[in-house]
Amino acid sequence: MLENLVVDNFFDNPDEIRKIALSRYYRYGNDNRGRSGWRGERSFPIRSLDKVCPCCQQEVDADFYSEQKLLIEYSKKIFDMCKKHFDIGEFNEEYTVTAYFHIATEKTLDSMPFFDQSKFHQDTGPIAGVVYLTPDAPPNAGTSILYAEENRIVNVENKYNRLVAYNGHRIHALSDAFGTTRETGRLAYTFFIHSALDPLHYD
């Protein structure tokens, strides 16, 4: 598999995407049906154009539907870019992409003991990544990816509207978190490319 994919200025309209993100409902990592939790807060999955809101089971309004359609179009763009960049033999129609908005603040750093060690993890799907959505974020609050065979860690800096995609099976983590509110915290559009036969794992 090739090295990480980094694309600056990914969203055509990052301010609009950020506004959508800050309007969404969020869940904490320990709210996801007993499965291992994520770090910080996440929106409900962005995967399909549903007429019913997953958080309240009410019919969505036209504005929400339009937002969801826009986000899914960007997710498809991410899928196509990753398919072109990464050399994965099994990367075919059996794979799909699930995305979320994800917020990590200073509170996230206290969410588990020894956070600097505990934050590192692997994903089940072949590709994962983020698009950073906090203007003027600390550069050192990006993404850290372990290359064990080379005994090194690659740190991708946090830059507004930068996309980074990487091998999800590599050990990785957010490099750091910051801010005290959703508006000032580390906001990202987080995505996973995974088997279409296993969507519930990404709820």
Predicted feature residues:
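Non-heme Fe(II)/2-oxoglutarate
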Residues: M1-S118
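Catalytic core of non-heme Fe(II) oxygenases with the double-stranded beta-helix
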Residues: T105-D203
